[in-house]
């Protein structure tokens, strides 16, 4: 029994239960940041550990309590443009622009020919009797091309100039115009339906491609023609001694003119017979005016040239017709 008891005690002492505690690290704590390699500030005992801070959770936009104190009307600009803040350099609308597609003026055919003519002229002035190979200011062994020889015929024929060679066609490519001035004229005459304008009816109806308008329009050439005719008439009135104004008298002026009309011819001093009027507004009988014009080309009253123009005096004839009716 003693052995059994001793064995039981020994067995119970050898198989004693062992309790082991395992600590799990919290999952919601941020890990310690990794220190850079070779850092001298690392503490072996962990006394300098960085306290982990919980990350703040951003408020959800779907939450009813979410709000912002910023101005709601202020929205970020999607497009933004800023000028260079420099004054525009070109303000002449390319009025002085030049054609830059042609050969430069210092190396084109005209410039080469001008240099050749100048070289020949200088060589003749220096030594007119020099040989052809010694043309120019350089040595006689320098070859300057077929056109570099001295012109020994100078003075016996028409001299070579650029202006004289242009017409003959021997100048070569002519220099293009550097400046070009264009004037455009636009005539906005509408295409009006002729049938609708004259009759007010068009067989095509609304499908007509011309404009249905019965108004009066004048194109540019018509306006210019009327202006030229008015200017000619004004200059003619000035040449005849008038003031050149085209003022048309009103009814009051017409009444005054009727009262100022003469009742007899200035020449024969008798009532008018076929009255006529001159440019200077003097009234005569037709027979008296022609008889006086055959002797003197000037007016009988004011001595101004009549130029042989005698118009029918409609005012005198109307007044004579009214007097007969009364």
Curated annotation (Swiss-Prot):
- The residue ranges flagged as biased composition, category Basic and acidic residues, are 104-125
Q: Region Disordered: which residues? A: 1-142
**PANTHER family per record:** RING FINGER PROTEIN 113B, ZINC FINGER PROTEIN 183
**Ranges of Gly residues compositional bias?**
1-14
List the RING-type zinc finger ranges.
265-303
Q: Which CDD domains match?
A: RING-HC_RNF113A_B
Q: Where is the composition biased (Polar residues)?
A: 81-100
Q: Which organism is it from?
A: Oryza sativa subsp. japonica (Rice)
Arranged from A to Z, the UniProt key words for this protein are: DNA-binding, Metal-binding, Zinc, Zinc-finger
Task: Give the top-rank taxon of the lineage listed in the UniProt record for this protein.
Answer: Eukaryota
Which GO molecular-function terms appear in the entry?
DNA binding; zinc ion binding
List compositional bias (Low complexity) regions by residue number: 47-64
Q: Where is the composition biased (Basic residues)?
A: 24-33
ZnF (C3H1-type) residues:
187-215
Q: What is the lineage of its organism?
A: Eukaryota, Viridiplantae, Streptophyta, Embryophyta, Tracheophyta
Q: Which GO terms describe its biological process?
A: snoRNA splicing
Protein name in the entry:
Zinc finger CCCH domain-containing protein 15
Q: Which GO terms describe its cellular component?
A: U2-type spliceosomal complex
